[in-house]
Amino acid sequence: MDNTHLIESSLRHQFLTMFRTDNAFIDGILTVMIISLLSYIVKQFSDLPSVIGNIYNKIMIKIRLFFRPKSADKISKTTIIESLSEDKKPNELYTAVYWFLTTNIDLTVDSNVKMSFTKKIELDEYKELKDKNINKNMSYGTKKIFNYTHNNMTFEIEYFFATNLVSVYTDKKRDKENHIIYLTTLIDPNIRFDVFEEFTKMCMREYAKSLVDKKWVQKIFTNNNGRWTETVFITDVNLNSYFA
């Protein structure tokens, strides 16, 4: 049962009795004012529980949203590229990706770097090294991060190198070292392409281009006032036109 009307009637009776002046004109004005004021006050108090309830519900919704487990916006994706395929044959994809990572990633400030030079160390006619390209590679197990962009989306890819031994059966069983590249990144679950497939294709293209750029060059050397100078005589690019 709604007690609002009973409360309003009781308060109106008490206020009219309290402020009665026995002057009909003044009492009439006071009655109108008191009734209007009490109606407004009682209405506000009757609406108060619903107002408080609405505020409480909104606060609780905010609290539940804040403390509920966050759904992951992105998922972790990992791929493994081994130097030996499943049938124990050389994996050319590994060669391309390894070339890209060791050629195009800056190792200048890395704390763990392996250095090697596998060619014969020789001097040229100017007493300078013929080949100054020292191989610099990451130490196995050391993680490194680089950014890869595809379709205007940038991915932060973490990678590291590792090895294991696999058994190869020919005329007899032999253990062979298998080199591994681990690649990991975070992707949007709604992504419409395979980021690692696109990345490895890019590595293959760049690796193939690097092989094409290694042109055969024939040089002639001329002694000019005691100093030898070299001139490119023939490259493989114009061999056909040269002998045509």
Swiss-Prot record:
It is a single-pass membrane protein. Keywords: Glycoprotein, Membrane, Transmembrane, Transmembrane helix. It is found in: Membrane. The keyword Chaperone does not apply. Glycans are attached at residues 137, 147, 152. The chain crosses the membrane at residues 26-42. Its main location: membrane. It comes from the Viruses. One of its GO terms (cellular component) is membrane. This is Uncharacterized protein L573. It comes from Acanthamoeba polyphaga mimivirus (APMV). The lineage of its organism: Viruses, Varidnaviria, Bamfordvirae, Nucleocytoviricota, Megaviricetes.
